[in-house]
Amino acid sequence: MNPLISAASVIAAGLAVGLSSIGPGVGQGTAAGQAVEGIARQPEAEGKIRGTLLLSLAFMEALTIYGLVVALALLFANPFV
């Protein structure tokens, strides 16, 4: 295996995980903050807000998992070799 391709694959895998974590991390922090504010304003709607928050957090986390899958594919099932 070409060492240049191996090195580029490792760097690309690191970038895939790192960059795919930035957006969902910021989004999850914003969503959680807004949910806390909403619950503070309307405590009786806590159950509905929490359910919606957990569902949206799961969708956001899926983006990070996609980045991890791409990184694992680059590391272990490298299509460029």
Curated annotation (Swiss-Prot):
GO terms for cellular component: chloroplast thylakoid membrane; proton-transporting ATP synthase complex; proton-transporting two-sector ATPase complex, proton-transporting domain. CDD domains: ATP-synt_Fo_c_ATPH (cd18183). Pfam families: ATP-synt_C. The keyword Cell wall biogenesis/degradation does not apply. It is found in: Plastid, Chloroplast thylakoid membrane. The chain crosses the membrane at residues 3-23, 57-77. It is a multi-pass membrane protein. Keywords: ATP synthesis, CF(0), Chloroplast, Hydrogen ion transport, Ion transport, Lipid-binding, Membrane, Plastid, Thylakoid, Transmembrane, Transmembrane helix, Transport. The record marks 61 as: Reversibly protonated during proton transport. F(1)F(0) ATP synthase produces ATP from ADP in the presence of a proton or sodium gradient. F-type ATPases consist of two structural domains, F(1) containing the extramembraneous catalytic core and F(0) containing the membrane proton channel, linked together by a central stalk and a peripheral stalk. During catalysis, ATP synthesis in the catalytic domain of F(1) is coupled via a rotary mechanism of the central stalk subunits to proton translocation. In plastids the F-type ATPase is also known as CF(1)CF(0). Belongs to the ATPase C chain family. This is ATP synthase subunit c, chloroplastic. It comes from Chara vulgaris. The lineage of its organism: Eukaryota, Viridiplantae, Streptophyta, Charophyceae, Charales.
